[in-house]
């Protein structure tokens, strides 16, 4: 039924807090339940605005305290609670308001008050026997809403009133780092060892976030440090992976197994090494971590530290006895990995751990490549220098019989070619195709390298298996300067 002019006047008076007009209109017989086009009554407007005297007057004149607004299904009590109007709430409850009425979303006045964090309104509703464990259509309770809002006093009041802390609320509080709320939830019966949909416990979640105070609260409540998630991760491996030093220390102190492996065989020490977190690596080693443990790919903590280039972690691991010669499943050693990446400082540290006469270590191959040939190919001049000074054989051949010198010629690395020659590289060795370093230099048109090779006694007229000489290769590629240089040095047609 559309509102009359008199109804509209009453609604306007209630909206603006005009007590005199409200009294006058009611005295004329205007309906106390007057409502606008959306179904909002004068009582609802007065309640949400906090006009307590108008609320009292309307109720005294028969206004329906439980009238439901057409839009969203709200009541005056819900509106008053949502707008923190404690006096309105008190009057409405005294007037018989249904404290557990639900709106279209299944929310109650208590949920609205919990969302807004008004402890006074919450207490009024609880005293009126509001249901603390009812949930809305999303499955959210007043306690969950209060925890999400971060209002400690409201959470405590709900807990004291018997609210049950389902575990989703605990995970929510942990993710937000709300230590005080977490403590309350645990006291309300939340299980610190329950797993979420990702099979992680609250302790694991706190370890990922790195919140030490939350970790300490959970541990004090009996959180189990040894629980695994679906990937075999524990709170400790996760904390190490995310680099949270204080959390790792706390978990180790609580008895966490430092050598436990995840589904891939990874350990906390490997995670610390891969992340370059020296303090965590130190804590774990002091707690007895197996320094040479291997994952399913036969990677070790040292392998990870070398791969990522963390010099300080590599130094620590070497001092503590990490194996420098262990190969992973692909056949790589720490030396090979350091060489290909040009990690000169790490390479030096590795070389210091072995005797220069240890040819098996220095010249170890993977897919026919040595540390030297890999470093040469990548153009890491300083790395090549360190390797040569460390005793590697400059003449060990790699893939297809190519020596480090040949690779330097192919890639045009002049300084490296000079280093190799000065370190005793044989300029006349042949690869599987019968080619010499000079032939490769001629094929690439590397004038400066050719000069180095000639000065080192390179044989000018050797032929490869295709019966080509260095001069022929230069002529074929129209390298006029190279042709002239070779002929001047004595190369024959």
PLM region descriptions:
Residues 1-41, 45, 181-194:
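N-terminal segments that cap or nucleate solenoid repeat domains
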Residues 3, 36, 69-70, 103, ...:
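Ankyrin repeat boundary/linker residues
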Residues 6, 39, 72-73, 106, ...:
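Start-of-repeat signature of ankyrin repeats
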Residues 32, 65, 99, 132, ...:
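Ankyrin-repeat inter-repeat connecting loop/turn
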């Amino acid at each position: 039924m559309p509102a009359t002019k008199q109804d509209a006047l009453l609604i306007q008076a209630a909206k603006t807090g005009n007590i005199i007009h409200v009294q006058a209109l009611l005295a004329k017989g205007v309906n106390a339940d007057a409502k606008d086009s959306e179904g909002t009554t004068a009582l609802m407007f007065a309640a949400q605005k906090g006009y307590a005297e108008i609320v009292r007057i309307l109720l005294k004149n028969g206004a329906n305290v439980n009238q439901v607004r057409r839009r969203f299904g709200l009541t005056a009590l819900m509106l008053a609670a949502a707008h923190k109007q404690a006096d309105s709430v008190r009057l409405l409850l005294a007037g018989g308001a249904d404290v557990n009425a639900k709106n279209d979303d299944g929310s109650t006045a208590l949920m609205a008050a919990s969302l807004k964090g008004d402890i006074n309104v919450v207490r009024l509703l609880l005293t009126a026997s509001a249901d603390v464990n009812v949930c809305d259509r999303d499955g959210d309770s007043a306690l969950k809403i209060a925890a999400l809002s971060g209002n400690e006093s409201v959470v405590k009041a709900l807990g004291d009133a018997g609210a049950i802390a389902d575990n989703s609320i605990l995970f929510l509080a942990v993710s937000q780092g709300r230590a005080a709320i977490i403590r309350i939830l645990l006291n309300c019966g939340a299980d610190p060892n329950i797993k979420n949909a990702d099979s992680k416990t609250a302790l694991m979640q706190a370890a990922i976030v790195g919140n030490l105070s939350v970790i300490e609260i959970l541990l004090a409540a009996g959180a189990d440090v040894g629980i695994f998630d679906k990937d075999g991760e524990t709170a400790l491996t996760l904390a190490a992976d995310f680099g949270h030093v204080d959390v790792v220390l706390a978990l180790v102190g609580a008895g966490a197994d430092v050598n436990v492996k995840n589904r891939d065989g990874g350990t906390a020490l490997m995670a610390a090494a891969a992340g370059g977190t020296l303090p965590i690596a130190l804590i774990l080693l002091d707690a007895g971590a197996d320094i040479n443990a291997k994952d399913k790919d036969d990677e070790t903590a040292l392998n990870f530290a070398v791969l990522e280039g963390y010099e300080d972690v590599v130094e620590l691991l070497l001092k503590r006895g990490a194996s420098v010669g262990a190969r992973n499943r692909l056949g790589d050693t720490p030396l090979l990995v350091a060489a290909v990446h040009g990690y000169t400082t790490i390479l030096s540290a590795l070389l210091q751990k072995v005797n220069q006469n240890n040819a098996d270590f220095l010249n170890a191959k993977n897919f026919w490549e040595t540390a030297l040939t890999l470093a040469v190919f990548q153009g890491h001049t300083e790395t090549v220098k360190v390797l040569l000074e460390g005793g590697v054989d400059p003449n060990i051949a790699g893939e297809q019989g190519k020596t480090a010198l040949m690779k330097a010629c192919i890639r045009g690395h002049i300084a490296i070619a000079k280093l190799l020659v000065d370190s005793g590289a044989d300029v006349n060795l042949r690869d599987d195709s019968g080619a010499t370093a000079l032939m490769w230099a001629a094929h690439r048109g590397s004038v400066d390298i050719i000069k180095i090779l000639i000065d080192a006694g390179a044989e000018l007229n050797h032929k490869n298996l295709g019966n080509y000489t260095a001069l022929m290769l230069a002529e074929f590629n129209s390298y006029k300067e190279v042709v002239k240089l070779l002929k001047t040095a004595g190369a024959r047609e």
